[in-house]
UniProtKB/Swiss-Prot annotation:
InterPro entries: ATPase_NBD, Carb_kinase_FGGY, Carb_kinase_FGGY_CS, FGGY_C, FGGY_N, Glycerol_kin. This is Glycerol kinase. It comes from Mycobacterium leprae (strain TN). Its EC number is 2.7.1.30. ATP binds at T15, T16, S17, T274, G318, Q322, G419. ADP binds at T15, R19, T274, G318, G419, N423. Glycerol binds at R85, E86, Y137, D252, Q253. Key enzyme in the regulation of glycerol uptake and metabolism. Catalyzes the phosphorylation of glycerol to yield sn-glycerol 3-phosphate.
Length: 508
């Protein structure tokens, strides 16, 4: 750690934007800079990002936040990275040029690959070894698609010229030199989202690679989330302007777990973003799900044993509110969803299931599509706004119930973070739907904070978990107001609505 370095920098490379946040010893945000990037939608179901644009945005936010605070590399003890998971990039080792756009986690072009895996029995092997169901969500199928459909990638992959990575790997490679010797590495949390890593061995699995015809030569090394030795060091002529060790990498939802200090078995958090991601810490135990959840690595610090988690991934939550704004035009901004929904006392019998790209946890139905059910002439825009907020909360209830069935753990409190947590009505509905207290922390940027914690622990900026727990502070708490009968009746309506969305698209 630099002698007078008083800060940790964290890069948060997300689905819609990239930000850099500076934190102090108290885990308090000192400064941030954020830039959005283009969402490329070539055809229905396809979602892409430009890797070069993402790298340029990352470099820009790094330089901007340092300039705005008059800080330099010598003030930064370490750099952490957190990122959108599963998004798949392939680039040339010698030139640094991507072979194609990144295929984003939301992209569904690989639906037939996923169906074929389940049909011939390979899906059960993937579930057993990787902890994941075959789905369009994960990187393995996306990488197979690139190898099969992008000219030149297959041959380049065989001879080691083509490199695969999720956004963390792409940023690490560029920050540490790119074609001039950049490191090609990922962490265990990101690797656990590919369908290619054995959860127990924490290494790429040859049988899983064979399912997707992926050459091992193109894969990054797998390291701890907070390794004993840095992943690498930023270059003096790079965007940081000096040498700073990169010592923490976590997929975004794993980073939020660390940022929320959910470090003990039985603790859970729910992140509300484009989608929702609810994780339950299961300690050193690998809990296999029989109820549609994912088994994943939560984090690994140093050379300690990894900590695992159960995860419920929900594809469409915050983006459903964006749909009200951008496609229907019934609100002018996300904040208006609350004021509009408050014009009614309930949903008026309306349920909205936003299965725009199918349903993720716990259903895993790529054949589902969105539906608004229960409409009558009595209903208004306000009922639809209310139903949209409720859909976010009911989908989370689906996951919480599945977690209880898999783990035997029933929550008594749920920590929450993400943009929608500023919507008081939505958080009150969440407490009512779950029947447990919902708690928001003071620091809103828990994802960036988690990667900062991972980086800081590696260099002694924080001594250990007790320091992180001391930093966590409650900002607001919502307590349930519904009775059990109301809760049960409302949720039964939701489950009925979900059934109406199934078998809509032929993915056979």
């Amino acid at each position: 750690m630099a002698e007078f370095a008083e800060f940790i920098a964290a890069i948060d490379q997300g689905t819609t934007s990239t930000r850099c946040v500076i934190f102090d010893h108290n885990g308090a945000e000192v400064a941030r800079h954020q830039l959005e990037h283009e969402q490329i939608l070539p055809r229905s179901g396809w979602v892409e990002h430009n890797p070069v644009e993402i790298w340029e945005r990352t470099a820009s936010v790094l330089m901007s936040v340092l300039n705005a605070t008059n800080l330099s590399a010598k003030d930064i003890a370490a750099l952490g990275i957190t990122n959108q998971r599963e998004t798949t990039l392939v680039w040339n080792r010698n030139t640094g040029r991507p072979y194609c756009n990144a295929i984003v986690w939301q992209d569904t072009r690989t639906d037939r690959i996923a169906v074929a895996l389940d049909r011939d029995g390979r899906g059960e092997v993937i579930r057993r070894k990787a902890g994941l169901p075959p789905a369009t969500y994960f990187s393995g199928g996306k990488l197979q698609w690139i190898l099969e459909n992008v000219d030149g990638v297959g041959a380049a992959a065989e001879n080691g010229e083509a490199l695969f990575g999720t956004p963390d790997t792409w940023l690490l490679w560029n920050l540490t030199g790119g074609p001039r010797g950049g490191v090609h590495v990922t962490d265990v949390t990101n690797a656990s989202r590919t369908m290619l890593m054995d959860l127990e061995k924490l290494d790429w699995d040859d049988e899983l690679l064979s399912f997707f015809s992926i050459p091992r030569a193109m894969l990054p090394a797998i390291a701890s989330s907070s390794p004993l030795q840095p992943y690498g060091v930023t270059l003096a002529d790079g965007p940081v302007g000096g040498e700073v060790p990169i010592t923490g990498v976590l997929g975004d939802q794993h980073a939020a777990m660390v940022g929320q200090v959910c470090l003990d078995a039985g603790e859970a958090k729910n992140t509300y973003g484009t989608g929702n991601f609810l994780l339950l810490n299961t300690g050193e135990a690998i809990v296999r799900s029989g109820n549609g959840l994912l088994t994943t690595v939560c984090y690994q610090f140093g050379d300690a044993k990894p900590v695992y988690a159960l995860e419920g991934s929900i594809a469409v939550t915050g983006s459903a509110v964006q749909w009200l704004r951008d496609q229907l035009g019934i609100i002018s901004g996300a904040a208006q969803s609350e004021s509009l929904a408050r014009q009614v006392v309930d949903n008026g019998g309306v349920y909205f299931v936003p299965a725009f790209s199918g349903l993720f946890s716990p259903y895993w139905r790529s054949d589902a599509r969105g539906a608004i059910v229960g409409l009558s002439r009595f209903n208004t825009n306000a009922h639809l706004a209310r139903a949209t907020l409720e859909a976010i909360c009911y989908q989370s209830r689906d996951v919480v119930d599945a977690m209880a069935a898999d783990s035997g753990v029933r929550l008594d409190v749920l920590k929450v973070d993400g943009g929608i947590t500023s919507n008081d009505l939505c958080m009150q509905i969440q407490a009512d739907v779950l029947g447990v207290d919902v708690v928001r922390s003071v620091v809103a940027e828990t994802t960036a904070l988690g990667s900062a914690y991972a980086a800081g622990l590696a260099v002694g900026f924080w001594a250990g978990p007790s320091d992180l727990r001391a930093n966590w502070q409650e900002d607001k708490r919502w307590t349930p107001t519904w009775g059990e009968d109301q809760r049960a009746a409302a949720y039964a309506g939701w489950r009925k609505a979900v059934q109406r969305t199934l078998d809509w698209v032929d993915v056979s």
